[in-house]
Amino acid sequence: MLFIIASLLALLCIIWLVVRGFANAFRFFADWLSDGEKLEDKESGVTAPATATTATTTATTPATATATTPATAANPTAKNRVVAIFSYPEKIHSTKAKRESYLDAMHMGWYQVVILFVAGSMAGLLLEEIWMLITAGLTESRVGLVWGPFSPLYGAGAVLLTLISYQLRRRHAPNVVVFCISAVVGGLLEEITGWGMLTFFHMQSWTYAFLPDHITEFVAWRFLFFWGLLGLMWCRFVMPRALYHIGEPTSKRQAIFITLISLYLVADIGMTVACFMRATARDVGIPPQNTFEQWVDMHYSNEFISARFQNLSTGVEKAK
């Protein structure tokens, strides 16, 4: 018994050290990205400061004064909060007032969208894997793309919920409105994704047809409730902290890194679509028509599809 307890404690220590190591590596990489040559400030034409500390010491010129927006006029440091990547301790111990002030001044862009998509895709995949392990005892691959640990449905959901929550927050929408809109958006996302996969690729990753409360094959009332609850929590708790921690790009390294990630995601999604199209064509006996399709058949065969997308059913016919 003592040996078992000691082994568990040792395992927990190893896990803690690994997690801490990854966290430190991530922090180091994030700090490295924020260093280097700074991006030019779009409004004032001056270099954006790297930290909030240096941002507050930047002298104000007549040019910057004329470019001041209403948000920054009401709060002179709002602009600094937008362009600055805050120091790690300040982000961790941020207050609600700081986050709200930052959200009032920031502008959503491609930088935030890409980070949210990647984080949502990976976090959603991890949570689904854990959920399947706890509820069904299954340890199957639930990825949605041929390269990398990504589930694009969760990534798209994170982006949509953030964009919608951001606008609802600006309009001071009540909780019931946030809940209903989030439920509708989540249901539409599931319906469009499921219908598109079945219609164009004859593939199916999930079905609610066996549930008594299903609305369509891909939408059920219980999951609309979960989408609404998730959207409400996202709007009130997750979104403000996520956008505050992501910040806005201040260095060329950050801009280049996000551009490379974007190109990788485009290639990953494009290759996944190509693999699904060839899998559908192979099922009906259509041979490859060009060198690229031959290469896809050679490297992404039906065996690869089955092993990679273990929850995916192929050759499914749409119900009439």
Can you name each region flagged by the protein language model?
Residues 1-52, 69-320:
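Aromatic-rich, lipid-facing transmembrane alpha helices and their immediate juxtamembrane interface loops
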Residues 52-70:
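Low-complexity tandem-repeat tracts in intrinsically disordered regions
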